[in-house]
Amino acid sequence: APALPDRRVIDTPYISQVTPVYAPVGCEPTSLLMGLKAKGYAQEVDLRSFLDAMPKHEYDPAQGFAGSPYQPDQSKRTTIYPAKLAEYGRQYGDVADFSGRSVEELQRELLSGNPVVVYVTLWWAEPYYRTYRMGDHEETLLRNNHAVLLCGYDSQTDQYNVADPYN
């Protein structure tokens, strides 16, 4: 395999989840769409079409986006989990679920020119949790969840380029 560069910034078209399409809890699919477009996929797909075509579920983010990306809902864990998001992304291009991979593996992907959707907390704040009704049971889950797209890395400074669809 060829040696990887020390630094790489992936040319990524920025897409906001707030304007012109207002999808205040649609960070995961918005980040994915930026990543797809950065790789040359989904060039003709606009955010609203992408959000509307995404798999949905009444309450279970493992089965589809829980709730609506257009409407905050305190009673629902409004997100879509990585495996289902990656499955959706594969309709448009080469997408992998990198859940549980090491930081070094993520850095290698970035230096290889592959953007990575990462699940973080909103504004990088301390995580906080609440209990959600999940069908016939309850689960305590992260409340201030957010997703952004890593689209660059510098191994000399250990800094990342981040495309945050909310900011």
Per-region residue spans from a language model:
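Active-site-adjacent substructure of cysteine-protease-like catalytic cores
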Residues: 100-161
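Short, solvent-exposed aromatic-acidic interface loops
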Residues: 164-167
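Short secondary-structure junctions and interdomain/linker hinges
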Residues: 61, 96, 116-117
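Mid-length scaffold segments of soluble, non-membrane domains
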Residues: 71-112
